[in-house]
């Protein structure tokens, strides 16, 4: 912990952001969301500040977390991945969303895509209930999730992950 000359303190952290080593000085109470936005990760959105919407979802050590609820100090020595670090996979899934017309206002897209990509890596042949549970933290204001499920079923089938009924 360092003093900043004004009576405050800062911490030095080192972490990997989208595969690149980063070194930063942060305030002990700084949230991961704020750090990521300062680093130019604009796919990370803040919609509620109460962990209710899922817009701020990122991966910490390959697991989805809500960056509005994680202290930046917790990423010291760890790997953080944002949508910017998953552009190839994200663009592939976004094509499915566009083809199916499931992308209306785009409010939920960042968190939804991050969770879908994490789920695809973690679960083989998920059931509809497993999918719903995995994506439960994503707030969608437009579609009621019907079109999201349709796109996800098609995506999983074409990726060879299928879906158990």
Describe each PLM feature range.
Residues 4-165:
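Signature of N-terminal electron-transfer/Fe-S-associated modules in redox systems
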């Amino acid at each position: 912990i360092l003093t900043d000359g004004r009576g405050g303190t800062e911490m030095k952290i080192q972490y990997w952001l989208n595969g690149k080593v980063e070194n930063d000085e942060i305030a002990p109470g700084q949230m991961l969301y704020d750090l990521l936005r300062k680093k130019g990760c604009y796919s990370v959105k803040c919609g509620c500040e109460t962990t209710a919407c899922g817009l701020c979802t990122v991966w910490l050590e390959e697991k989805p977390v809500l960056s509005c609820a994680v202290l930046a100090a917790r990423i010291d020595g760890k790997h953080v991945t944002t949508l910017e670090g998953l552009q190839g996979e994200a663009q592939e899934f976004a094509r499915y969303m566009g083809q199916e017309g499931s992308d209306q206002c785009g409010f939920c897209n960042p968190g939804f895509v991050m969770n879908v990509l994490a789920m695809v890596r973690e679960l083989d042949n998920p059931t509809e209930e497993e999918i719903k549970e995995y994506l439960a933290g994503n707030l969608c204001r437009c579609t009621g999730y019907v079109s999201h499920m349709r796109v996800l079923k098609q995506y999983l089938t074409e990726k060879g992950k299928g879906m158990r009924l």
